[in-house]
Amino acid sequence: MHYGYIGLGNLGGHCAQNMRRAGFDVSVFDAKPEAADALVEDGITVCGSASDVAATADHVITCLPNPAVSERVLDEILPNMSPDATWIEMSTNGRDEIIAFSGKAAEFGVRTLEAPVTGGVHLAAVGQMTMLVGGDDDLVALHTPALMAMGNAIFHMGPIGSASIIKVITNMLAFIHLKATSEALMLAKRGGLDLGQAWHAIKASSGNSFVHETEGALILNGSYDIGFSIDLALKDLGFALGFGREFGVPLDLASATEQTYVAAKAAYGGLAESPEIAKLLEHLLNTDLRADGFPEKLTIETAG
C-alpha cells in the first residue's frame, strides 16, 4: 500500500521513516523542502507539492500545526485523491473541525480517519507512540498495519470527533502536570534539597508522572527542548477549555495553566518550548532549576 505523508515536523518525519522501514511505499511533502532531505536515503519519494502527493499515493496522511493549515492542505489534496482513498488526519483538531473536514472529504468520495498521537518526539523516533483513533471500524482495520508502524498502541475511541476529544484531554493533563512539576521542583530547590535526588524521589513516588520523568528532566538540564511550542500548548488548552464550556465542566486547573502559558508566551514568545513555563518561576525567584546528569534531549534511552 502506498501512503502519502504531508507535514514533516517534529513528529511527521519520524512517522514517514517508520512507515517506510515497515515496508510501505511512502511519498512526502513539506512546505519547508529541507525537512525531507533526511528521508531520501530511506527510499522515500519527495514530491513538489501536497497535490502531487495526493495524485501519487493510495491514501494520504497529514500531520500539521493547526486546523487552518489542515483545511488549506485538505482543499489542495482532495481533487487529486481517488474516490476510494482515505485521508488520515494526525493533527490535533477540535471535534467540530475534524467533523467538518470529514464532511468536506466525503463530498469527494474520500473517507476520513482521525489519528492524533501522544507520547512525544522521542517515542515517535522509535515507532512507540500511542495512536488515538476515530472513525469507522473497517477503516481502522484497513490501516492498522500502517498505524502500528508509527505506534505501539491503538485506542479506537469511536466515530470521527471522538479521538479529538481524548487527545485534547491528554494534552490538557500534560500541561497541568508540567506546571505542577515546575512548582514541585522549585519547592525542592528553595527547600534546600538536591534537585537531582528530589527528581529521582518524585519519580519513585505516588506523585510521579510521565511529564515529570520526561519534561522535568529537560528543565533540570536547562534545554527545555521537548519539540513542542508554547503556541501549540495554547492551541490545545483553548480546545480543552472550549470542551469544558460545551460540556458544562469547570476546568479550574486548565484555566490556571492557560494563564501561565499566556504569561510565558509574553515573556519568551510563542515558538519557545512549552517546558519554558518553568522559567517564569526561575526568573521570578531568581533561582535556577539546574542539576547535573540530565539529558539535553530525550531519546528512548534517556527518557525516565
What would you call each of these model-derived segments?
Residues 142, 162-284:
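Helical "substrate-binding/catalytic lid" subdomain
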Residues 8, 93-171, 175:
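Rossmann-fold dinucleotide-binding core
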Residues 26, 46, 112-113, 154, ...:
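Hydrophobic beta-strand scaffold residues
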Residues 31-32, 66, 136:
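Residues in the short beta-alpha loop(s) of Rossmann-like NAD(P)-binding domains
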Residues 50-111:
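Rossmann-fold NAD(P) dinucleotide-binding segment
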